[in-house]
Amino acid sequence: MKVAIVFDSAGTLVKIMRVIKDLKKNKFICNSQTVDIVDKKKGRALVIIKEDPLKVVDKENPEKLISDLLKEVEIGISYCNPPINREGIFKDRKTKVKELQEPLNILKRYEVETGYGSALIIDTYAGEVEYTIATAGCLFKEVKETIKQLKDLGVKVFIASGDRKGFIKRLAEITGVDERYIMAEAHQELKRDLIRNLKKEGYFTIMVGDGANDVPAMIESDLAVVTLQNGNVSRRALETADIKIYNIKEIVDICKKVINGEIKGRMQIKECS
């Protein structure tokens, strides 16, 4: 049997450090996923800066408008609560770059493996930056060995993530995942389409994630797995998953059972539960 597994990155392979600033309250938020914040309001978009924030955010004039910065750098929408107004991404005329620098400066105090990311949550209809975000992370200690064992079993391993390309390329380097099998800046439809295409190629597909943006791919997959290792899981992902795991290494035994015919897919899991 041909088996392909698609991993999300943040919270799944990487112990993520995420600093989110609520600009209206002027406070930092703990234990929240950015996609869950986006889901709370129509018209919100999670906008990522595709370039290294240490080069394009950290060194920028703090008093510069964020909307002007966004016009100068490469950006992407990794998640949204449609419908959105794309022009509204550039309409905020009061929020300054220092609001992006503040969460980044907090994370710069830590030693990280994956590099840094900067993002914003924007109300695209109000034309207002509501949250600024910085991310960084370190691999869960079991990840390298887990991926090695999966490859030894003949499982094709993919990483599909909304994170910027530099972040995901670095993750592929340190985990041993073939760079041909990574998908950066992947919104939820791209993850779903990856699963769909792998199924067309004859693979039994497993989607592993913990976020709301993993849910369409989970639904499309033959088997959906949610990982609880990071400790902060989207309710939608939890409700959609067929199997819950508490450590990423558990996925090896799941794949063995799939290969041996002990797990034949979603229907069998539901019949046994």
From Swiss-Prot:
Pfam families membership: Hydrolase
PANTHER family given in the database record: P-TYPE CATION-TRANSPORTING ATPASE
Regulation: Inhibited by orthovanadate.
GO terms for MF: ATP binding; hydrolase activity; metal ion binding
Swiss-Prot/TrEMBL keywords: ATP-binding, Hydrolase, Magnesium, Metal-binding, Nucleotide-binding, Phosphoprotein
Thermal dependence: Optimum temperature is 50 degrees Celsius.
Active site: D8
Matching InterPro entries: HAD-like_sf (IPR036412), HAD_sf (IPR023214)
Organism encoding this protein: Methanocaldococcus jannaschii (strain ATCC 43067 / DSM 2661 / JAL-1 / JCM 10045 / NBRC 100440) (Methanococcus jannaschii)
Family: Belongs to the cation transport ATPase (P-type) (TC 3.A.3) family. Type IB subfamily.
SUPFAM superfamilies: HAD-like
Cofactors demanded by this protein: Mg(2+)
Function in brief: Most probably acts as a phosphatase in the cytosol.
EC number, as in UniProt: 3.6.3.-
Protein name in the entry: Soluble P-type ATPase-like phosphatase
